[in-house]
Amino acid sequence: IGAGTGGLPSSNPGFYSNTYFFEAFRSWTGIAIDYDSDWYFSVKNSRNCKCVCEDLLEKNINEILSENECPELIDYISIDVDDAQWKVFHDLNFSKYKFNVLTLEHNLFQTLESCTQNRSEEHKQKVLKEYDAYREVLSSHGYKILWADVNLDGYGPVEDWWVSQEIFDRYADIYSESNNFKEAFNVISR
């Protein structure tokens, strides 16, 4: 979800896409959703997955998943939809849809930087409370945080990586032996 380029023009259909790797190198299938019509028209013929152009501030994520016949057990979901991030997260029916692996972009570093520059300490504490709340929701649905506050190319923290209890139990030894999240995630995603 949020398979676009983050507002950056690109001729590369995988530019800034968490899911493109799995499609291109693991032969995974799925659905890519983004509100950017420029993204949609630039990648709809170059991606193997189904590409959907929808504004997730306007349309409920569960409707889109249902309309596109997504299974109730989804191997991987990446939620990176900027302004619609928290709406999608709160709308998502965790009772119906289960995920083996979930990445949720939070861009906490940008949010806190903005709070420091433009907002009060009270606003910063409100943001941190919301951030903790989404982690509590995922934990309450049985997800385990694999890596918190993952940094991306010197930016960070940008996202958290979560796994289902089953995946966590299956790969706990890899996780505990490695601080290299890319190595462990590569094993998990095979």
Q: Which role does the model predict for each range below?
A:
Residues I1-N62, L108-Q110:
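SAM cofactor-binding core of SAM-dependent methyltransferases
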Residues N62-E63, D82:
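A Trp-anchored, charged/polar loop motif used as the substrate-binding/catalytic surface
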